[in-house]
């Protein structure tokens, strides 16, 4: 909702200010200039990126406007899933994990936490790295190194669409100047026309410059930034899993290992340690009652 509101404010501010200065709205409609700028921009995106990145770019851009923030319930389910998995190891040993991590989609434990099981990448990351831990013969330091490399690779791949969009956005003023120069060339072909005719051609050329700058700073720049922030939010859950596993292998008790992961959750949605204790105590009471 905030993204839609922000977009409305941008358009209202730019066009509203132009209208307040008695600007002619019809002069802003220059299809030829828009074709030049959009064609150059879209073409450069296609030339510079593989189709996988382009597809992910569309998905991430759409997700900016329909994305639901991972709230407290998501964080609770993530932390309690990690707690239950580690408790399963404490009670039944590493072999007890097999029934859950081999086919996590069919695991009763994973299905207890639907917000996590809906996140395929996150669930696969949890299952794969608990499986790695279950194989044994790996130290906390080695696991931390492996997971850090994996997360770096994932971040690089997931951030590529926003980086590509940002670079193209930075080029849009240049494409606007390109369109403006072509407009001036057309104007020079009518140099013997009336002052009004020459003025209209110059105005059309300047609209190209305006459109390129508008796309850069009012659309593509903010959109690429929002895409990057969304990816960083998603990666924070993976960082939580990594830290929890490393702390467990380092010999920390289950609660402290999960709390180490809790500290990597984003500040505005991070539950307090007391909340984690309450959730764990409720789980322990239910398990004892059963």
Where are each of the predicted segments found?
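Large intracellular
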Residues: 19-161, 233-290
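Structural signature of hydrophobic alpha-helical transmembrane segments
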Residues: 3-7, 32-34
């Amino acid at each position: 909702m905030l993204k839609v509101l922000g977009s409305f404010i941008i358009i209202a501010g730019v066009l509203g200010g132009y209208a307040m200065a008695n600007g002619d709205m019809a002069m802003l409609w220059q299809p030829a200039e828009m074709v030049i700028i959009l064609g150059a921009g879209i073409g450069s995106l296609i030339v510079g990126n593989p189709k996988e990145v382009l597809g992910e770019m569309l998905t991430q851009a759409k997700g900016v406007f329909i994305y639901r923030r991972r709230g407290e319930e998501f964080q609770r389910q993530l932390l309690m899933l990690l707690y239950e998995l580690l408790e399963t190891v404490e009670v039944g040993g590493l072999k007890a994990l097999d029934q859950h991590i081999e086919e996590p989609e069919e695991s009763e434990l994973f299905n207890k936490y639907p917000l996590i099981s809906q996140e395929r990448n996150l669930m696969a990351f949890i299952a794969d790295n608990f499986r790695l831990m279950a194989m044994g013969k790996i130290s906390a330091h080695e696991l931390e190194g492996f997971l850090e490399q994996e997360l770096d690779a994932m971040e690089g791949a997931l951030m590529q669409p926003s980086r590509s969009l940002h670079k193209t956005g930075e080029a849009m003023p240049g494409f606007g100047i390109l369109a403006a120069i072509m407009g001036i060339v057309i104007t020079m072909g009518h140099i013997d026309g009336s002052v009004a005719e020459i003025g209209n051609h110059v105005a059309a050329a300047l609209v190209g410059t305006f459109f390129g700058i508008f796309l850069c700073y009012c659309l593509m720049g903010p959109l690429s930034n929002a895409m990057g922030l969304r990816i960083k939010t998603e990666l924070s859950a993976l960082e939580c899993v990594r830290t929890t596993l490393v702390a467990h292998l380092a010999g920390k008790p289950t609660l402290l290992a999960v709390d180490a992961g809790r500290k990597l959750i984003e500040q505005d949605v991070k539950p307090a340690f007391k909340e984690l204790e309450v959730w764990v105590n409720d789980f322990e009471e239910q398990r004892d009652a059963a």
